[in-house]
């Protein structure tokens, strides 16, 4: 397991119901009622009995179609929504129990947020936009300028400090949004479809940039998208939502290899699994291969040439120089040739 230790966010049986008397309604709700049953009763189940943990340093991607409950769930994590049932802990504190003052402190000091609409202040320069949250914190001009310049450099916008938002491309504006939320050094970073307003090429560039940033900063991230490819590229784990519930929460490898519901399987149908599945996941422990090992972090696609040309049935797999098992070449070839 890559992520150990206590979770940063821990959600247990969380419900968020919209309607006239959600708390009263939830009390009378029979187990097993579907989203449509609840709607027939005049309520909307924005979040339906969700339990999940987000580990420190993990990037959890929440994926689902429009209306599946992604934003509502994330709003519950920061208590922008009061939940109807269940509990949410952030850094070991039950956020439902925090006073308004403590909640504001928590949001201000620990949580960063980036949204699809960049939300920049049009009459402020890049520098002043990025420094804005620091100004809100009462930092002096010199300190906030220094920090703002640091994060502007980090997101690749050095030299554009004095530009106004309208003078920047969409991708650059989103970089300003990212820099602004990084300025306060949040422990937990919520990103709600941050790249969906960008055209496909820029979007890909931003994803790469984002992975580079994350490798450097190691933040705990909850990232919302409705784009499965984006989820597969970025996520340590993906939570797939439907009708307010989490259908499956797993690594990209597991989601494409072992979808647990028909709904998740449908999402994975079109995916080129060879691009997602890693040798480390195919390695069977205790099975001994022969010869030169392949790297656990390599995808099946990256190993394509070797898999086709090699004659070994079992190929050893090594993680950080240690052999962890061996993969069945035929099985990997099946993934490559989409036969699995
Ligand atoms: N304030 C609200 N009042 C009533 N219903 C709401 C409210 N906010 C969200 N909902 C409903 O809750 C459900 C989940 O909405 P949510 O915005 O979380 O979905 P989403 O997956 O984030 O969608 P999108 O990708 O379109 O942003 C939807 O049926 C929505 O209509």
UniProtKB/Swiss-Prot annotation:
PROSITE patterns documented for this protein: ABC_TRANSPORTER_1, ABC_TRANSPORTER_2
Record-listed E.C. numbers: 7.6.2.9
Any one GO MF annotation of this record: ATP hydrolysis activity
Annotated Gene Ontology cellular component terms: plasma membrane
Disruption phenotype: The double mutant tmoXW shows significant reduced growth on TMAO as a sole nitrogen source. Growth on trimethylamine (TMA), glycine betaine (GBT), choline and carnitine is unaffected.
BP terms from Gene Ontology: glycine betaine transport
Binding site for ATP: 64-71
InterPro entries in the cross-refs: AAA+_ATPase, ABC_osmolyte_uptake_ATP-bind, ABC_transporter-like_ATP-bd, ABC_transporter-like_CS, Gly-betaine_transp_ATP-bd, P-loop_NTPase
Disulfide-bond pairs as recorded: none
Catalytic activity from the UniProt record: a quaternary ammonium(out) + ATP + H2O = a quaternary ammonium(in) + ADP + phosphate + H(+)
Membrane in keyword set: yes
Localization of this protein: Cell inner membrane
NCBIfam families: proV
UniProt family annotation: Belongs to the ABC transporter superfamily.
Subunit structure: The complex is probably composed of two ATP-binding proteins (TmoW), two transmembrane proteins (TmoV) and a solute-binding protein (TmoX).
PANTHER family: GLYCINE BETAINE/PROLINE BETAINE TRANSPORT SYSTEM ATP-BINDING PROTEIN PROV (PTHR43869), GLYCINE BETAINE_PROLINE BETAINE TRANSPORT SYSTEM ATP-BINDING PROTEIN PROV (PTHR43869:SF1)
Cited function: Part of the ABC transporter complex TmoXWV involved in trimethylamine N-oxide (TMAO) import. Responsible for energy coupling to the transport system. Is specific for TMAO and essential for TMAO metabolism.
Protein name per UniProt: Trimethylamine N-oxide transport system ATP-binding protein TmoW
């Amino acid at each position: 397991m890559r992520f150990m230790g206590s979770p940063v966010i821990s959600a247990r049986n969380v419900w968020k119901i919209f309607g006239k008397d959600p708390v009263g309604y939830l009390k009378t709700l029979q187990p097993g009622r579907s989203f449509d049953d609840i709607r027939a009763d005049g309520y909307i189940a924005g979040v339906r009995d969700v339990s999940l943990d987000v580990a420190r340093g993990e990037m959890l991607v929440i994926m689902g179609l429009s209306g599946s409950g992604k934003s509502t769930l994330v709003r519950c994590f920061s208590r922008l929504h009061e939940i109807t049932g269940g509990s949410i802990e952030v850094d070991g504190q039950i956020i439902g129990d925090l006073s308004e003052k403590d909640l504001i402190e928590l949001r201000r000091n620990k949580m960063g947020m980036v949204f699809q609409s960049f939300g920049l202040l049009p009459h402020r320069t890049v520098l002043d936009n990025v420094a804005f949250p620091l100004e809100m914190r009462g930092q002096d001009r010199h300190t906030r300028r220094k920090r703002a310049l640091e994060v502007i450099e980090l997101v690749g916008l050095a030299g554009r400090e004095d530009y106004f938002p309208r003078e920047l491309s969409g991708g650059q504006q989103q970089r300003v949004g990212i820099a602004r939320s990084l300025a306060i050094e949040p422990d937990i970073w919520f990103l709600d479809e941050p790249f969906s307003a960008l055209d496909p090429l820029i979007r890909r560039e931003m994803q790469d940039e984002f992975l580079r940033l994350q490798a450097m900063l190691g933040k705990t991230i909850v990232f919302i998208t409705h784009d499965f490819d984006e989820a597969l590229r970025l996520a340590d784990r993906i939570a797939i939502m439907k009708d307010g519930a989490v259908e499956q929460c797993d690594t990209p490898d597991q989601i494409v290899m072992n979808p647990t519901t028909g709904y998740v399987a449908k999402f994975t149908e079109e995916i080129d699994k060879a691009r997602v599945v890693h040798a480390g996941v195919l390695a069977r422990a205790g099975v001994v291969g022969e010869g030169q090992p392949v790297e656990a972090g390599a995808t099946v696609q990256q190993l394509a040439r070797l898999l086709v040309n090699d004659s070994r049935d079992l190929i050893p797999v090594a993680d950080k120089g240690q052999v962890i098992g061996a993969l069945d070449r035929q099985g990997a070839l099946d993934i490559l040739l989409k036969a699995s």
